Amino acid sequence: MTVLIIGMGNIGKKLVELGNFEKIYAYDRISKDIPGVVRLDEFQVPSDVSTVVECASPEAVKEYSLQILKNPVNYIIISTSAFADEVFRERFFSELKNSPARVFFPSGAIGGLDVLSSIKDFVKNVRIETIKPPKSLGLDLKGKTVVFEGSVEEASKLFPRNINVASTIGLIVGFEKVKVTIVADPAMDHNIHIVRISSAIGNYEFKIENIPSPENPKTSMLTVYSILRTLRNLESKIIFG
């Protein structure tokens, strides 16, 4: 598999380290050269690339997606908070209808998306509570504080890099059905996501506590392995979930 990785932060570097690729291209505006990786000075999708992995930012998703969709590639997107922007969301999916690309949204930092996608037509509402250390939100607080309650769209304007989980859920069931609560807790050194699903099929609750990556406490290693699983599934004859 030949891949193009957009973003050479902690996630991108881990993919290079742990992935099994024939060739790796990378596009990153600030990263230095990495051994074994062909760095692109300008954004493009080389003709031998079969899979594009975005692990940069919601801004990168908005800037490069329409160009990527012109190519017959597998496009894996992590920064799903870009889709909280309704205008971009509508344009993206309009372009996708006639695109030769296939788009994949890994589960990222949470689980339970197999359940959610299976019953999406029966979901009444989803409530997601995210508990984070204040520093990861750019805050300096002394006590546990609810810093936000509301829609995914509203949350994305205040915390654009902390709403990927809620945005992925919104893409599955519809953003209008998702309510977000963000809690900053100084006692926490990791992130907790609690997802509560109410549906005509049943009611479900998932609690995910992620251990931060040693290299970057803001990143969950589960996200890295979620991308690797998606990459393996592209070539596997057996797929679970």
Curated annotation (Swiss-Prot):
Single annotated GO MF: oxidoreductase activity, acting on the CH-NH2 group of donors, NAD or NADP as acceptor
The UniProt record lists the keyword Oxidoreductase: yes
EC number(s) recorded for this UniProt protein: 1.4.1.21
Catalysed reactions, semicolon-separated: L-aspartate + NADP(+) + H2O = oxaloacetate + NH4(+) + NADPH + H(+); L-aspartate + NAD(+) + H2O = oxaloacetate + NH4(+) + NADH + H(+)
Membrane spanning residue stretches: none
Key words of the record: NAD, NADP, Oxidoreductase, Pyridine nucleotide biosynthesis
Residues that coordinate or bind NAD(+): N10, I11, D28, A56, S57, E63, Y64, I78, S79, A109, N164
Pathway(s) this gene product operates in, as recorded in its UniProt entry: Cofactor biosynthesis; NAD(+) biosynthesis; iminoaspartate from L-aspartate (dehydrogenase route): step 1/1
GO-annotated biological processes: NAD biosynthetic process
Gene3D superfamilies recorded: Dihydrodipicolinate Reductase, domain 2, NAD(P)-binding Rossmann-like Domain
Coiled-coil intervals, chain numbering: none
UniProt subunit comment: Homodimer.
PANTHER family in the record: ASPARTATE DEHYDROGENASE DOMAIN-CONTAINING PROTEIN (PTHR31873:SF6), L-ASPARTATE DEHYDROGENASE-RELATED (PTHR31873)
UniProt miscellaneous comment: The iminoaspartate product is unstable in aqueous solution and can decompose to oxaloacetate and ammonia.
NCBIfam families: NAD_NadX (TIGR03855), PRK13303.1-4 (NF009829)
Protein name per UniProt: L-aspartate dehydrogenase
